[in-house]
């Protein structure tokens, strides 16, 4: 049973890490950018994330 708990803990850590990475991969509105993909739900216009 201990192995099962270890595996669940390991998966939880991986999920948390992936979510944290995804959250940091995009910039909020008004942030500096180069490509549209850098902005969360916005476009990159004049080097700034805009709606």
Curated annotation (Swiss-Prot):
Keyword Iron set for record: no
Claim: Signal is one of the keywords in the record: yes
Domain notes per entry: The presence of a 'disulfide through disulfide knot' structurally defines this protein as a knottin.
Tissue expression profile of the protein: Expressed by the venom gland. The most highly expressed peptides U-Asilidin1-Mar1a is around 3000 times higher expressed in the venom thoracic glands compared to its body tissues.
Entry keywords, A to Z: Disulfide bond, Knottin, Neurotoxin, Secreted, Signal, Toxin
GO CC terms, sorted: extracellular region
Subcellular location: Secreted
Stated role: Induces neurotoxic effect on honeybees, including slow movements, disorientation and paralysis. Since it provokes similar symptoms than omega-atracotoxin, it is probable that it acts in the same way by inhibiting voltage-gated calcium channels.
GO terms assigned for molecular function: toxin activity
Disulphide bonds in the chain: 26-40, 33-44, 39-49
Family indicated by similarity: Belongs to the asilidin-1 family.
Name of this protein: U-Asilidin(1)-Eru1a
Signal peptide interval: 1-23
